[in-house]
Amino acid sequence: MTPIIIFGAAVRPDNSPSPALRRRVEAAARFGAGLPDALYLPTGGKGRHGEAESTVMAALLRELGAAPDRIREEPTGTDTLSSVRACRALLRDLGHQGPVFAATSRYHLPRCLLLLRIAGLAARPVPIGPSRADRWTLRWYWRLREVPAIPYDAALMLWHRRG
């Protein structure tokens, strides 16, 4: 099995995926299509609108041709850290010990990979295409937003590993 963890993003009020969520799922589906044993792990709980992010992502994966038995929803993650912890537990329960792949937005990828690695998972990135955030102003906004989040979440993950 080759797990592909898809990190959540906003669901719109009409229950459709936001553009960021759609890009993450499409990148994971493209990547997983080339693997004989892809296991998609969409992670994300219920946000402000609609169903849980994981449920919306699972539906989109099926629309894109992923077999339902290759999708395992993780609907409890409320942020990046809790999603990593929940996916680590799920993979442990499945007996998985190999590499995992992370599908998310470019700005979010360094934090996801770091947290997965601190959690003891051999994490690698899923290639993702360009996004709206490729405009320099948005690109810097999203990058700067990650500056405090990376050390904060890393410290919390290390603390959780101790306990």
Question: Where are the regions a protein language model picked out?
Answer:
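A transmembrane-helix-recognition feature enriched in membrane-embedded lipid enzymes
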Residues: 136-163
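A structural signal for short, hydrophobic/glycine-enriched beta-strand patches
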Residues: 1-140
